[in-house]
Amino acid sequence: AGVTSFKIEGRAKSAYYTATVTNAYRAALDAVKNGEPVPKWAVDEVYKVSHRQYCTGFYFNKDDANQYYENSGYIRECDFVGVIDSCENGRVNITQRNYFTVHDDLEVLSPGKTPVKLDIPYLINSKGEQTEIANRATEKMYFDYPVSFPPHSIIRKPLSK
């Protein structure tokens, strides 16, 4: 009798939520399978999606740990700001999702990889104009960058604590 599947709890989870959590779970499962500790970055990832306070639930069979009653609000540590559509000849083509600037600390989350920092030097908007600000949801933009990322990689902005 082994584990045959995992379920991500909740309804209507976003692409950002699903990508972040499944990437972290995959890294954790692979580590456990190989007899290694779960990587710290994978544990940290589940806190980077919008979530309510985590608890152990029924895991330790304690009556007082089954639910968390102090606050039912959501916690969010990162904003989902864009999707990488393609990378060709050093050019990264993106679709902007939420406001960001080239001065923001950004990260890229790609399937099966540890998230990496992204320092965007400038942006070219859909009118062909150079800008430092992405403030039109779903606008197609691009920038030149020495590293290539797979299509559908996610760009996020960690929020100040």
Per-segment meaning from a language model:
Residues A1-K161:
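Surface-exposed amphipathic alpha-helical tracts and adjacent flexible/coil segments at the periphery
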